């Protein structure tokens, strides 16, 4: 799967094009609606820059035959220590550092989006987000430092013999396990943050389902972090048997995929006009089953109509206002 240079380049370019389109549409939508740019927007641009860097690295690695090709030896085999493998290790270290930073920027962008949408109306959520944003920032910083210092003061041991690597870099694999586990946990928590808020909105059921589905696009990011974790764990267990370059290629490719998929997922809530048209038939079906009781009998015509674009919370401002109104009504009751 990973010894296909043309496929790796094509996949990298396609993901970059899709993320570029998503970020471009996000900004053009804001300019068209004359909305302000917030921290969440600039953070996603920073993540896109890191994603672009990872794409260039992937293509460069394939071009110099350090990624996407077989070397014929396992990563801990003394015969595998060649210039080709060392170049791949340099690329892999850059992938690790840029990948963690890019993923962290995506998470922070999503958290700041929640802040601008919901924090004003929800005091408890505001307090939680302050803590959560701090933890996410510390998560990224700590694992970037862990990547830089995985061999302590013997950084060159990463590119040395297996004996040197095992002697000086013993914490690298446990640190990697901790990173992929906490990455998944952070993605999952970030994904479910808006669910109680959206369920509490005083809007039509179909609108509520549609809004929820748009936020749950973030499940793509959770799925990619699970996949990357699986690839990392499987690769670390196969260091004695699997081809060295294939292991590094697989890890680098899923590092890139997680960042790019995260950017796409983070742009989802701000591309509601496009996604509304895509999800409307599905939400109509779900809502009709959800409310197939007395409400259907009393309002048959209402349930037969698809939600129009003007009826939906189609912008950040509308959704923030809807959240504020719902919280005010709940407080009044």
Model-flagged regions — what are they?
Residues 1-320:
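Extracytosolic/lumenal membrane-interface segments
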Residues 314-333:
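Fungal low-complexity intrinsically disordered segments enriched in serine/threonine and acidic residues
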């Amino acid at each position: 799967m990973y010894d296909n240079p043309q496929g790796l380049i094509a996949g990298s370019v396609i993901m970059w094009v899709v993320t570029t389109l998503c970020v471009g549409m996000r900004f053009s939508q804001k300019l068209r609606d004359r909305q302000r740019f917030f921290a969440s927007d600039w953070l996603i641009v920073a993540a896109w820059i890191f994603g672009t860097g990872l794409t260039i690295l992937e293509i460069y690695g394939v071009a110099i035959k350090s990624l996407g090709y077989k070397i014929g030896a396992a990563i801990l085999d003394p015969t595998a220590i060649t210039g080709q493998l060392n170049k791949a290790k340099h690329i892999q270290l850059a992938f690790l550092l840029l990948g963690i930073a890019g993923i962290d920027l995506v998470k922070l962008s999503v958290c700041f989006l929640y802040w601008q949408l919901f924090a004003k109306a929800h005091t408890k959520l505001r307090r939680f987000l302050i803590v959560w944003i701090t933890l996410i920032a510390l998560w990224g910083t700590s694992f970037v430092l862990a990547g830089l210092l995985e061999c302590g003061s013997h950084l060159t041991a990463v590119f040395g013999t297996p004996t040197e690597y095992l002697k000086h870099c013993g914490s690298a694999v446990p640190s990697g396990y901790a990173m992929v586990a906490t990455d998944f946990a952070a993605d999952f928590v970030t994904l479910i943050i808006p669910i109680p808020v959206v369920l509490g909105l005083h809007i039509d059921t179909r609108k509520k389902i549609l809004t929820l589905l748009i936020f749950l696009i973030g499940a793509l990011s959770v799925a990619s972090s699970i996949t990357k974790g699986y690839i990392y764990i499987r690769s670390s267990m196969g260091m004695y048997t699997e081809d060295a370059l294939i292991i590094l290629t697989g890890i680098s490719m899923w590092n890139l995929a997680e960042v790019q998929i995260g950017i796409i997922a983070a742009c989802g809530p701000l591309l509601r006009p496009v996604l509304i048209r895509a999800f409307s038939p599905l939400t109509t079906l779900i809502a009709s089953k959800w409310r197939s009781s007395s409400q259907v009998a009393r309002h048959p015509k209402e349930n037969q109509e698809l939600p129009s674009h003007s009826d939906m919370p189609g912008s950040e401002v509308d959704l923030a206002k809807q959240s504020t109104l719902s919280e005010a009504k709940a407080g009044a009751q």
